Amino acid sequence: MFYIAIILAGGTGALLRHLLGRATVNLGWAALPFGTLIANLVGCFLIGYLSWMLVYKWHMSKEIQIVVLTGFLGGFTTFSAFSLEVISMAEEGSPIKAIAYVGIQVTLSLMMCFAGLLLARQL
């Protein structure tokens, strides 16, 4: 049952990431892959926040922690899509855009993870 929960959580996270990506394209935000950026930023915040809350505030089991952090957030965030997007930008003649996207993604992702941890520690 534990493995099924991880699979379902991962699938749910992946589906939400896909829908987010489609929504950003439908909004006309095609200059950068904003769906991946938003998913990674939200996911980084949530992993910072939930990794603290699940253990220290809510006292959840290790299994629940794995389902939420590895399953759901692992499916929701994506480093592989980010990597492919960067390479595609560079190969399509936009190396500066690719480098800027790396800087934005990494810097903001670290900041969001830290913000999530800080918020959780204050509660």
What are these regions (language model features)?
Residues 1-123:
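Membrane-interface helix-loop junctions in multi-pass transporters/channels
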